[in-house]
Curated annotation (Swiss-Prot):
Residues 198-209, 247-265 have a biased composition (Polar residues). The lineage of its organism: Eukaryota, Metazoa, Chordata, Craniata, Vertebrata. Transcriptional activator. Activates transcription of GNRHR, via binding to the downstream activin regulatory element (DARE) in the gene promoter. Residues 195-287 are annotated as: Disordered. This is Homeobox protein DLX-3. It is found in: Nucleus; Cytoplasm. It comes from the Eukaryota. Heterodimer with MEIS1. Interacts with IPO7; the interaction facilitates nuclear translocation of DLX3 in dental papilla cells. Pfam families: DLL_N, Homeodomain. It comes from Mus musculus (Mouse). Keywords: Activator, Cytoplasm, Developmental protein, DNA-binding, Homeobox, Nucleus, Transcription, Transcription regulation.
């Protein structure tokens, strides 16, 4: 054992001394030595003997080099580890499994947290929850009552205006009028309609109610038909027409005032004939 170690040590010392002598000779001459081939074989032989016991792969093995750095603490994080990709894949798979697990658990929870607010289960049957009733003030009730006496049916603009005046919604006004009409019809059938809501005082009910026969009878007797009026008595026959006897006749009055001009302004027989129902005028009666 010690003999082999001594031989290796002596060979190493011989190599060192020969290399020193070779470098000293090369410094003296500016050119390379002539025996280049022999020197190459001389250097290659001891190198082969020295590195024969150690394979080439062990000196350049990256894993061995990596573990040496791990011992010194320079690469403690393991960034250059060949198994880093597997650890990353495992962590990613764990993250994927973690993300997929709560998803099916959230679906039934979301369904349970959002039930319908207006439907309640009573004895296994769905029952709709009624909304709270609207409480009207005395001022609102008085205004609605006065408007109901005028008209039992409101148009859309009228309903919107009334709701804005009373501070109510249009739905509340519509529901109040519907309830009031149903109550009024029930009282009307039972004969308990108050005087203020009688058909004579309400325009809308007057149109819907049947006509009163007493009103039609009194109107027919009080206002007789014009066809039943007696004819006026016939006028007595006179020789002179009516327009001559009437002193207010403007044409006759002007003719009497201007006597000498009677022949210059003869009367129009067509208009005079239509004006009087009697016989045609006689021009000789004027004189």
């Amino acid at each position: 054992m010690s003999g082999s170690f001594d031989r290796k040590l002596s060979s190493i010392l011989t190599d060192i001394s020969s290399s020193l002598s070779c470098h000293a000779g090369s410094k003296d001459s500016p050119t390379l030595p002539e025996s280049t081939v022999t020197d190459l074989g001389y250097y290659s032989a001891p190198q082969h003997d020295y590195y024969s016991g150690q394979p080439y792969g062990q000196t350049v093995n990256p894993y061995t080099y990596h573990h040496q750095f791990n011992l010194n603490g320079l690469a403690g994080t393991g960034a250059y580890s060949p198994k880093s990709e597997y650890t990353y894949g495992g962590s990613y798979r764990q993250y994927g499994a973690y993300r997929e697990q709560p998803l099916p658990a959230q679906d039934p929870v979301s369904v349970k947290e959002e039930p319908e607010a207006e439907v309640r289960m009573v004895n296994g049957k769905p029952k709709k929850v009624r909304k709270p009733r609207t409480i009207y003030s005395s001022y609102q009730l008085a205004a609605l009552q006065r408007r109901f006496q005028k008209a039992q049916y409101l148009a859309l603009p009228e309903r919107a205006e009334l709701a804005a005046q009373l501070g109510l919604t249009q739905t509340q006004v519509k529901i109040w009028f519907q309830n009031r009409r149903s109550k009024f019809k029930k009282l009307y059938k039972n004969g308990e309609v108050p005087l203020e809501h009688s058909p004579n005082n309400s325009d809308s009910m007057a149109c819907n109610s049947p006509p009163s026969p007493a009103l039609w009878d009194t109107s027919s007797h009080s206002t007789p038909a014009p066809a039943r009026n007696p004819l006026p008595p016939p006028l007595p026959y006179s020789a002179s027409p009516n327009y001559l006897d009437d002193p207010t006749n403007s044409w006759y009055h002007t003719q009497n005032l201007s006597g000498p001009h009677l022949q210059q302004q003869p009367p129009q027989p067509a208009t005079l004939h239509h004006a009087s129902p009697g016989p045609p005028p006689n021009p000789g009666a004027v004189y």
